[in-house]
Amino acid sequence: MWSVINDFLVNVDNFVWGVPLMVLIMAGGLLLTVRLGLLQIRKLPLALKWMIQNEEEAEGEISSFAALCTALSATIGTGNIVGVATAVCAGGPGALFWMVAAAFLGMATKYSEGLLAVKYRIVAPDGHSLGGPFYYIEQGMGKNWKWLAKLFAFFGVCVGLFGIGTFSQVNGIASAINGFFDPDNAHCVKILPFLGEYSWSVVIASLILTVCVAAVLIGGVKRIASVSQIVVPFMAILYFAFASILIICNITEIPAAIKVIVTAAFTPKAVTGGTVGSMFVAMQKGVARGIFSNEAGLGSAPIAAAAAQTKEPVRQGLVSMTGTFIDTIVICTLTGLSIVLTGAWQVEGLEGVEVTTYAFQQGLPFPPAVSSFVLMLCLVFFAFTTILGWDYYSERCLEYLSGGNLKHVKVYRWIYIFAVFIGPYMTVSAVWTIADIFNGLMALPNMIALFALSGVVVKETKAFFKKQS
């Protein structure tokens, strides 16, 4: 039964992430990169400066840095640790190349999303800011396109409830905790007859995680932002430090690893023994898992950007852009290099977080238990903040769909918390396939909007920097 369902999901995933969507996402990023004159290179130093510098006397609910941390809390998660591993194992080392290439173009995409979110945001009757693709589709493209805005919002709820927001994150947390405390599944319990047996560590993790998530979500966006501002920078620095140590310890192997990555991206037969189709798999998995990780083109980050305290759309666009740089070009690259350098992607029988754990155990000059513990800690907190960020995103999507009915949002919040509870009991492959499917469906209406509104982005950008000069 489960194998039939899994095969069906894989076929749907391959259809959604076929050539048309891949071309749409890459071409959209390329178009914006060209029209903005490589803005992601020219203005990156300024963007990094503004990332930590608050704007005075600006409208909004939270600071630009808090908005970025909220966005990063939703992006830096299992995608950086587990997603990279699954991409490299499925598509070969070449998947890492396409992940970084998509992220470079995605920086222009993320900039455009942040700019449009602030430009077209509105203020709700209770005073909180509302914005995102559904508003810039409706207001920027016109009322005739409201159906596209609703389609985006619907898939946004699905991604939060079944994809990035819950199942993949809590599944990753449970796998990491189980791998550290009970790797041999020696202590199992039976929850329900149809669920089978699960390690006690998985059961306890699901209970504790559910309680912690519920405690934070009840406080709304400001509590989510407060938690994210503390947790995200600290854990990102910790993970960066340990991954960097691994790279430095294997620095002599880096040229060979880069050669393998680039070669596999274009002629994967030499690496995987595949044909031309294998190159497409590398591109498919690299782009899909890259979007899972950095969310450029997905349309989620502009929902948080709309709440930022800023009066300049361009400024928030630049701050939003740094999220993709930090998430994929820095953190995912470190993870991918670690996996390739240690050969973890070639070890049979490993999947998901086990691949990255193996890489850390083999590549770091510390006892395996220490390496595993650090990775588990990073994954738990990364995934926890992602769960929080995606609840905010999906609630705003539902708020738009329901015409501002906050009663529906409150009911949804408890359904979301229940989804967190059941996530650990799903299989790794099913979790990631479902996430990929809904990501693609959510990205489609957003990318159509970015193509249509690219002229607005260029006009706003030129006007802003002309005023600054």
Identify the residue ranges that each predicted region occupies.
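Extracellular loop-to-transmembrane helix junctions
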Residues: D13-L46, C89-H128, L148, D327-L334, ...
